[in-house]
């Protein structure tokens, strides 16, 4: 049987993610610790005392570091996916799992991407949301009505 792995994008993060893996697995630790970042990855992922984990410049490297660590644990156990894919940010984790990037490269690229996205939105009153279980037509109608207040658009459908 062939295994396919789908890596999560932004939005699946939560404080404490990966902490038990980090404490238990040298393979997870090696992947997780491989990148050089300008913030304390452990503190943000495992504790999030300042509530910054949901800010894109922190979310993105945290999610990719977690995924790279999990991939390292799977590889250590002899589990090698035949197929990998990622949802948006998860593409970086999938590329690392496929051997295109090292964990260090994937995490550092995600940090760069997250910072660029945060900088692009800096000073702009903006936001985004995930809408679940609503058909496209009523969603488009809601966006059209809300457009009277400012720019409201559907970005993508997952």
Where are these regions (language model features)?
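Helix-rich "cap/lid" substructures immediately adjacent to catalytic or cofactor-binding pockets
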Residues: 1-85, 134
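Alpha/beta catalytic cores of group-transfer enzymes, especially the acyltransferase/condensing modules
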Residues: 10-12, 37-42, 98-158
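An amphipathic alpha-helix/helix-turn recognition signal
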Residues: 30, 62, 88-89, 101, ...
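Short, glycine/charge-rich beta-strand/loop segments that flank catalytic centers
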Residues: 47-51, 85-89, 114, 126-130
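Hydrophobic side chains within alpha-helical segments
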Residues: 63, 70, 94-96, 116
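Gly/Ala-rich beta-loop-alpha elbow adjacent to hydrolase catalytic centers
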Residues: 67, 82, 86-90, 94, ...
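Alpha-helix C-terminal capping segments
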Residues: 73-77, 95-100
């Amino acid at each position: 049987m062939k295994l396919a792995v789908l890596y999560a994008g932004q939005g699946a993060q939560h404080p404490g993610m990966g902490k038990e893996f980090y404490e238990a697995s040298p393979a997870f630790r090696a992947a997780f610790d491989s990148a050089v970042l300008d913030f304390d990855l452990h503190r943000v992922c495992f504790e999030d005392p300042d509530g910054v984990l949901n800010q894109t410049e922190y979310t993105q490297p945290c999610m990719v570091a977690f995924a790279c660590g999990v991939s390292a644990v799977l590889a250590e156990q002899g589990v090698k996916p035949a197929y990998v894919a990622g949802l948006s940010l998860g593409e970086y984790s999938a590329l690392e799992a496929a051997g295109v990037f090292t964990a260090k490269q994937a995490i550092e690229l995600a940090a760069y991407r997250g910072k660029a996205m945060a900088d692009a939105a800096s000073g702009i009153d903006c936001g985004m949301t995930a809408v679940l279980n609503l058909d496209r037509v009523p969603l488009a109608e809601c966006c059209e009505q809300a457009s009277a207040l400012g720019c409201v658009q559907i970005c993508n459908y997952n």
